[in-house]
Amino acid sequence: MRRRTFIKMSALCAAVAAASALTACGGDKSTSTAASSAASSTAAGAAEGDFGGRTVTVGIWGGNDQETAAINKLKENFEADHNCKVELKVYTDYNTQIQADFIGKTAPDVFYIDASMFPFYSSLGVMDVLDPEEYSLGEFYPNLVEAFTDADGNVQCVPKDASTLATYYNIDLLESVGFTAEDIPGDYAEYKAFLTDLQARLDEKYGPNQIAAMTYNQDLSRNLYILQDGTDGLIDAEGKPVLTGDRVVSNMDFILDLVHAGVWKTPSDLGLGWNGEAFGTGKTVIMEEGNWVYGTLKVDYSDIHFGVKEMPVYNGTQYSMSYTVGYGIYAMSQNKDMASAWIKYVTSVDGLTIWCSGAGCLPPRADAAKAMDVESDPVWAVHSAMTACSLPWQLGSNLSIINTAYQNYLP
């Protein structure tokens, strides 16, 4: 699906001096957690899983009330099952603060890593290599595991959740101009003709530029699968952007064609902040959005009659984007046995059911999705179906630079 490329530190993160300090404190990342567990344990002779009142520190970023309740439930269960304490270290500026902790050699035993940042942190050597069999990674969606696999094929994080894009449509607005959900094409090749017709009908009924046929995000995190289709990726082996190849330009032209035709508009074009607001206020008929918008629509825009369908095919391939976060183990942790046990629990079917049900995200493994009965909710069912074919949001260590270049290219 894509070529994995990693490079050393770039302007995305800290200065060269900080990177050197981080690399120096990272230790040998070839040391597996399984091999180092015995050395890190101070509970000799204790029963398996009994950590004798020790404390494991878990680095996370803050969330909403539902996420806080879910992580606290996991904490409570783990403490009860393992006779230990879990200290949740909540960062308010995650990437800045945890890098400072790496430099100071005070990082948590186990911590969140966003897939978009994994190439950077992997290059620093601050995480242990994990044994796929030990963490049951065969049960996880392969594309999500790949997002946390380094250039040498070593897995360094276990996915803890995911979100995907799907196509949302306003049923009432469609029907008001003579369309139904079945008329929305399943192939991007048919989008321009359909959206042009839809926009013309909307303008005739509601007035010019009152309601958009479709909104999109001017961001690679949403459009990467289109630009990257049929290529070896948007970065070369050295991590430099490759945005001028014929296929990339052709894919870019496809997006520009929809924008120039006036059938793809950004929420800001409508004077609004994001897709959810544009859709919820009835200012757009169709949007491609992540499952996080579902709660917003149910709570803040409950009068909107909407449906959800899979993302359209592009050049014969079914795509979506996914946004995943994993747990990594600090290479210098003195509690690797506890960190490992924490990951195994929170990424088990039981742990994921607690976390994903509470936090409103998708489980990274199919058996957990089945246990959660995501198929019983038509919205969650579509988003879950998109997981296996999704492209995780990740683009080497120069992600922000490449994304800015892309945004500057679009009108």
Task: Provide a role label for each language-model segment.
Residues 146-148, 302, 306-309, 357-408:
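Long, aromatic- and glycine/proline-rich binding clefts that accommodate carbohydrate-like moieties
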Residues 61, 111, 118, 221-222, ...:
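Extracytoplasmic/periplasmic substrate-binding proteins
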